[in-house]
Design a protein with these regions (language model features):
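Alpha/beta-hydrolase superfamily serine-hydrolase fold, recognizing
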Residues: 20-254
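Bacterial Sec-dependent N-terminal signal peptides
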Residues: 1-24
């Protein structure tokens, strides 16, 4: 318990660092010197959407606690893992974490729950290959911004959950993507940067009601016509007293 709390505090401190400049004076970007493993396929297929990158600190330690990073794209993109690392991953590496930045299938590739299935497959892959990449999976945090924050929150609130039902609609949250379905997909801490928590409240925004909205693309229809599915995409619907430690960051204009 104490180790998990300490890791979350370290994660929060690293988040504060994200607000600091990441370049040297004059716009010169400091060269990367830390160990990196690029384009690892966590699903055992050929999809770009199923690749991840691992970044380790340059301290030479034997193992590092892990933070998974998910980019934001309104669920439209399937290949922005590099942007996820540059946006919020680099300060975490500087703070001593191993950062795993992942791709996932877009709403154009497949409808929900494919995206959370991919996230969980990536977590299982990391556990299965912890020794190969110097990872200490006794702590796995997850963070992301916008739609990546949404998927991070969803990963956290669905620890120990295989399927979930709302009304007459059931979704397979865990999924069976990849070769490591015997491994756990649980996470120990979540930091959500302005990702939707209750998708139903987004109905107040006129653009969300549109059948062409990002939310509609994610679930395969207008949100107003699919209330059960909208609820199933909402992290709020899964909250119990047993969820891991959470930090959700929103602004007044989100």
């Amino acid at each position: 318990m104490k180790k998990a709390i300490l890791s979350l505090l370290m994660l929060c401190c690293a988040i504060v660092m994200m607000a600091q400049p990441q370049s040297a004076p004059g716009g010169f970007k400091m060269p990367e010197t830390n160990p990196q493993y690029k384009d690892l396929n966590y699903a055992g297929d050929s999809l770009e959407a199923h690749r991840l990158d691992i970044y380790l600190p340059a301290t030479g330690h034997e193992k590092y606690k892990v933070v998974m990073v998910i980019y934001g794209s309104a669920w439209f993109a399937n290949n922005m893992k590099a942007m996820g690392y540059l946006s919020i991953g680099k300060p975490l590496v500087d703070a001593g974490f191993a950062v795993v930045s992942i791709n996932h299938r877009s709403s154009g590739d497949a409808k929900f729950p494919a995206q959370i299935n991919d996230v969980k497959a990536a977590i299982r892959y990391i556990r299965a290959h912890a020794e190969d990449y110097h990872l200490d999976t006794s702590f796995i945090g997850i963070t992301g911004y916008s739609s990546g924050g949404h998927l991070s929150s969803l990963a956290g609130v669905t620890n120990h959950m295989k399927t979930h039902t709302v009304g007459k609609t059931t979704v397979d949250i865990e999924g069976n993507v990849g070769h490591y379905t015997d491994y756990s997909s649980e996470v120990d801490a979540v930091v959500d940067w302005f990702g939707p928590i209750d998708m139903a409240t987004m109905e107040r925004c006129e653009t969300v009601k549109d059948a062409k909205s990002p939310e509609a693309a994610l679930i395969g229809g207008a949100p107003a016509d699919m209330p059960d599915m909208i609820s199933l995409t909402s992290p709020y619907s899964y909250v119990t007293p047993n969820i891991p430690r959470f930090l959700v960051i929103h602004g007044n204009s989100d």
